[in-house]
Amino acid sequence: MDVADAQIGQLRVKDDVGIRTQKLFQDFLEEFKENGEIKYTRPAANLESPDRCTLEVSFEDVEKYDQNLATAIIEEYYHVYPFLCQSVSNYVKDRIGLKTNKDCYVAFTEVPTRHKVRDLTTSKIGTLIRISGQVVRTHPVHPELVSGTFMCLDCQTEIRNVEQQFKFTNPTICRNPVCSNRRRFMLDVEKSLFLDFQKIRIQETQAELPRGCIPRAVEIILRSELVETVQAGDRYDFTGTLIVVPDVSVLAMPGTRAESGSRHKPGEGMEGVTGLKALGMRELNYRMAFLACSVQATTARFGGTDLPMSEVTAEDMKKQMTDAEWHKIYEMSKDRNLYQNLITCLFPSIYGNDEVKRGILLQLFGGVAKTTIEKTSLRGDVNVCIVGDPSTAKSQFLKQVSDFSPRAIYTSGKASSAAGLTAAVVRDEESFDFVIEAGALMLADNGICCIDEFDKMDLRDQVAIHEAMEQQTISIARAGVRATLNARTSILAAANPINGRYDRSKSLQQNIQLSAPIMSRFDLFFILVDECNEVVDYAIARKIVDLHSNIEESVERAYSREEVLRYVTFARQFKPIIGQEAGKMLVENYGHLRQRDTGTAGRSTWRITVRQLESMIRLSEAMAKLECSNRVLERHVKEAFRLLNKSIIRVEQPDIHLDDDDDLDVDDGIQDDIDMENNGSAANTETDTLDTSGASTVQKKKFTLSFEDYKNLSTMLVLHMRGEEARCEVEGSDSGMKRSDVVTWYLEQVADQIESEDELISRKNLIEKLIDRLIYHDQVIIPLKTSNLSRIKGPAEEQVDNDPLLVVHPNYVVD
């Protein structure tokens, strides 16, 4: 409603409800006491500062003072809000004695009921409510015209305090009684009131979202001191009211096209039928938004009491818990089998894989984030990657973690882009400015981001999360927007091996399509291999049948899901310090890892660097948090070192049976192996006795090499052959070595180790079978034959192909 000018003497309608509420609220500010003194005297004194204009009032205090006043504020909040602000201005002016008129505002906190974004309906318009959600988009700060001063262009009358209804609003009529101007007004910018204004968008959290539904979103309007107080990815509670605003984006859409050569005069009929605005016509394009008066970070609940998680400590949590909750946490911390009981409660439907469960459990607790003197941030979150064959419960691990953790985001690598994982720069529908929209890593800030099918991601998308995994920030420089955003999240990834099955004869890096920088940023790698084991298969089948037959009774848990979540939230607040003994053990264990990496011919899955030392520190701190300890002890370091070994050591390699590839060879080598004895140390033999027709006995000798001997021998052959190829290329002759030349060269190298003719024959057969495996199985060596189109060859072709030229595959890289 327009406020009348006193000089003109125009009448104003008296608002009895607003005036009565203003008087009651001012009495509340002047009379409400806490601990014997008026509570809001000191906060009101702080409003004397030029950059402060909002007084925060606890709604619980209003309910204690007058229940009728609290009911009136809740039900008629938008109606009485200007009167509440006027009472705050009067109270501040009386208490401080301000000589200038300063507009003050009120912000309510601790509103009892919290609503979800999905529950916002038109019935809540104008009432005081509190909603919670996750910020997914933030807009830049703009000035907003709140109260305008206009000048009539017909009679030059000044019209003050014209309230703006969420869009530019002209006075309905000139205040001068002798002037009936309704359209021709000009805004006086110097005498108008502007406030800072920021628009953000929040959406439902993952925990509140019904399964299979699209998250609902709502726009939040922040004013004055609230601007730039929220960040994309964080979760907040917003207190305010639901309003209806004109949909400017629809109004700004282009209408009919401009026609050239119109018969009308210039400027005539530009607005269609004129005069309808004077009759009260309004556009019907509106949408709902939320006008916030206070913002608080979303908090965890203990005993029904909220605590700000950014400033909370373990002692604060203890004070806010009930006696039963505290006794249960204390009992759990003294449990000798707490480590095992927690993984049983977290993953009751998954059989086995206890090491993976322990690693994920320590990821939930996390390490301690630190900041050096040079302001360099050291991450405390633990990153875990699970690599395994299909049907080894990889996705089940991720699903259960995303359901359990309160701040967890589940996404698939193949269906996610770089912008969807980090952050996107999009154009605003109304102002057409570029704004930042949070991705999965930002939405999982201070939580866990579960990425399934991690190996299916494009290479450019993997590169986009390098910074987020180590520095825990996301830097954006696109479309004129430059920003560094927080991504303090742990990453739990699942990947499938190349070709679907994990090849034990290859290293971890050769089994997955991940770059070395990405692999080094994971603290733990767990390899799950689907093996045929009668005992394990029976136990897994029994577990699955029990789950399908009776889901509730088949799961035995020492603690409930809520108790585990409460314990994890409480234990995460500890910040253990590394003691002198634990630090000494960390240094010694890191030295052992480095020595073993350089001295065991590639027994590790990847190169041991300082990042593995930092991983050991984070795991040790997580173990200390699990026990609610303020110091990292030696047993914590020992368990972290053992768990890290599970991922650093290569999966135990099986022996190489050279005779397994006889069917791929040109010649069947069975008859050549009869009556052959192997007395050398390089290979072991196994004798199979085959009875044919009960009379004759055929013995087949099988050559078996350990994986390490196989790699050393094949590397020696490849390096020699490449050296010969390089020499032949320089001399200009045919490149490559004949098969017989390779065998002869090897026998010359081991001539001093051969003591008998039988051993010479054994060595010769061994190297020939090794060459066959490198040709037909590993495809490291390429035979240059004259005819390889058919396996049935004539005598002439057979004689030519018995001793082909051998060359190393040009794409083969020696480990």
UniProtKB/Swiss-Prot annotation:
Early fractionation of eukaryotic MCM proteins yielded a variety of dimeric, trimeric and tetrameric complexes with unclear biological significance. Specifically a MCM467 subcomplex is shown to have in vitro helicase activity which is inhibited by the MCM2 subunit. The MCM2-7 hexamer is the proposed physiological active complex. It comes from Drosophila pseudoobscura pseudoobscura. Its EC number is 3.6.4.12. InterPro entries: MCM, MCM6, Mcm6_C, MCM_CS, MCM_dom, MCM_lid, MCM_N, MCM_OB. Acts as a component of the Mcm2-7 complex (Mcm complex) which is the putative replicative helicase essential for 'once per cell cycle' DNA replication initiation and elongation in eukaryotic cells. Core component of CDC45-MCM-GINS (CMG) helicase, the molecular machine that unwinds template DNA during replication, and around which the replisome is built. Its main location: nucleus. Gene3D superfamilies: 1.20.58.870, 2.20.28.10, mini-chromosome maintenance (MCM) complex, chain A, domain 1, Nucleic acid-binding proteins, P-loop containing nucleotide triphosphate hydrolases. Residues 338-544 form the MCM domain. This is DNA replication licensing factor Mcm6. GO terms for molecular function: ATP binding; ATP hydrolysis activity; single-stranded 3'-5' DNA helicase activity; single-stranded DNA binding; zinc ion binding. A zinc finger (C4-type) spans 152-179. ADP binds at R611, E614.
